[in-house]
Amino acid sequence: MKFLLTAINAKFIHSNPAIYSLRAGVGEKLQPYVELAEFTINESLESILEGIWKRQPKVIGFSCYIWNWKLIREILTELPKILPDTEIWLGGPEVTYDGPGLLREFPQVTGIMVGEGEVTFREVLEQYLREAETAGQSEQQPESDSTEQQVADRRGTVAGKSVVERFGQI
């Protein structure tokens, strides 16, 4: 199971500390399940999509800010075409103000992480790992026949400790 945390930075020399903080916040035991990817707004959409596709994540999270939101919106439209079974999560200041509205606008998005990112991300990651363990899936998890229903059951915004309870709302 691979959860890809993705940052689209304003410049090549900039880095996104949020994704590093999220990975550090899950602790050493869970860090092997988290991969980081950084791109810039100056890269082409095709180049970014190729970089994501090469990593083949089961789940991808985007760190959304005012400087990258337009490009992320384009990625959200194209990503399901190349990785149809990859679940998509959003987080960051550009998306947390209207989670339900964004979920209606982008039905391909599984959920929006709100609240304390480190707490919320850890809970989301733990939930995916519990599901994989319950399903008896190895690290190279085969897709189950009910993936579409599992996504529908979990879709929604999440906040802090209530993340598992709130899967399925919206």
Question: Predicted segment positions?
Answer:
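Short acidic-aromatic active-site loops that bind/stabilize oxyanions
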Residues: 11-12, 65
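N-terminal subdomain of nucleotide-sugar transferases
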Residues: 1-3, 26-33
